[in-house]
Amino acid sequence: MTSKRTVSDSKRAFFAAYPRPVNSIYRRVIDELLVEVHLLITNQDFRHDPLFATGLLTAYQALMEGYTPVEQRDAILRALCTALELSYEQLHTDAAQWRAIAAELPAQEVLEVMAGKREAGDGRLKAMGDTLAGIANAERFKYSRLFSLGLANILEQAGRAAAMSEKDRLERLQQICTYLKLDYNRVKRDLDFFHSVLERIKRSKEVVDELSQTERRKREERAVSQPG
């Protein structure tokens, strides 16, 4: 994205790409995500990598889980990508490749490469290791909440294969943060905050659904009570 584009430009581009109304509580969700990503990718230190891609898709899928109609979720994501000048296809390809590495290759090897404790041979794991080494050795790296979500998602994929406990997972996360020169406490706070946001959205949707059901019952009762 060119740095000359503003947040307002991105918002206008989104509404041009997706002119349909967005349902209730999700309007704010999409607006905040668009602003967050815009500010991130226009930062001069930002570099696209598979963990950003994984984090963005993880965030979007989790935040929009309850959105209806379901078939519009993908259309909204495509509009966001258009507005932010991101490649929808590249995001999915990058995320799918790293999720597959974490799920399909030996979990211990993946976890050691992620923590900088093993040099991978050729193939997919080496590509992951090279990317992480580049981040660890970068003079200027733009950390983001989306990066932390991507990191946590890949760690979760590998953790399932290794049958890790929550305690083990957090210890692994701390090791990876040390290798990548990230503040573990900040990463943990960002992950906890994201989960709290998901809980608030879930509760808000439950309230909206309950109000809708109550209103529908009232309409049905009025219809029954009215003389034919």
UniProtKB/Swiss-Prot annotation:
Keyword annotations: Coiled coil
GO cellular component: plasma membrane-derived thylakoid photosystem II
GO biological process: photosystem II assembly
Coiled coil: 201-223
Any Pfam family the entry gives: ThylakoidFormat
Domain of life from the UniProt record: Bacteria
Listed InterPro entries: Thf1
Chain segments carrying region Disordered: 209-228
Protein function: May be involved in photosynthetic membrane biogenesis.
Assigned protein family: Belongs to the THF1 family.
Name of the protein this chain belongs to: Protein Thf1
